[in-house]
Regions:
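Functionally important transmembrane alpha-helices
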Residues: 101-154
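Hydrophobic core of alpha-helical transmembrane segments in multi-pass integral membrane proteins
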Residues: 7-14, 158-178
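Residue-level signature of the transmembrane alpha-helical core
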Residues: 5-6, 51-56, 60, 86-90, ...
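Membrane-interface starts of transmembrane alpha-helices
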Residues: 46-50, 54, 76-88, 121-124, ...
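Short, Lys/Arg-enriched, Gly/Pro-containing loop segments at transmembrane-helix junctions
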Residues: 179-184
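Juxtamembrane helix-loop-helix connectors linking adjacent transmembrane helices
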Residues: 1-58, 76, 146
Length: 184
């Protein structure tokens, strides 16, 4: 199961690159981005609170809802697993209510959904979600930027390339390790 952490980190880097392409200025995006920045600045004043909320409570509650109830419920009702994973990831993305987090949450929700489907346990998605949120909270509170690649002083395309490689290799190894055999 250790392959899921590089897989998650890879998706985080890919997502970070894609989210960086969403405008933060303009008639629509500018005021929305300013509101979100102000809200996060206000939240960031309570270090213990932000870690408690984002690293402990959110992963636990959100994974129960989106993977444990929505995704599992759809699969139990006969929806194909791929469609259930996509739908629960989309709902997870929309739940985050702003374009920057929606894209990120959707993509990460895909990884969380696959991991939940393959492991049949909420523990791994909760740990991955906490891992993602810990990195985000740490960068928000301690970094110059919320971007992993910016904090490492790397061009964003390096982050994308590393992300794709990490995601692809670890996804392949995870799927190979967790393949399902059918008896005839």
């Amino acid at each position: 199961y250790l392959m899921i952490f590089p897989m998650m980190l890879g998706m985080m880097l890919v997502s970070e690159f894609l989210v960086s392409k969403i405008p933060i200025e303009g008639e629509f995006f500018g005021p929305l981005y300013d509101q979100m920045s102000d809200a996060f600045s206000t939240i960031a004043t309570d270090t213990a609170g932000i870690y408690l909320l984002t690293v402990l409570f959110a992963p636990f509650l959100e994974e129960i809802l989106f993977r444990g109830i929505i995704q599992k419920g759809l699969i139990n009702k006969g929806v194909k697993p791929a469609k259930a994973i996509i739908f629960s990831a989309l709902a997870f993305g929309i739940f985050h209510l702003n374009p920057w987090q929606t894209v990120n949450a959707f993509l990460l929700g895909l990884v969380l959904g696959v991991v939940y489907y393959k492991t049949k346990s909420l523990l791994m998605p909760i740990l991955l979600h906490a891992f993602n949120n810990f990195i985000s909270a740490y960068l928000l509170l301690n970094g110059n930027s919320e971007s992993v690649t910016e904090n490492l002083h790397l061009p964003e395309y390096y982050g994308l390339i590393v992300g794709i490689v990490l995601l692809s290799v670890s996804y392949y190894l995870f799927m190979y390790r967790n393949r399902i055999y059918y008896r005839e």
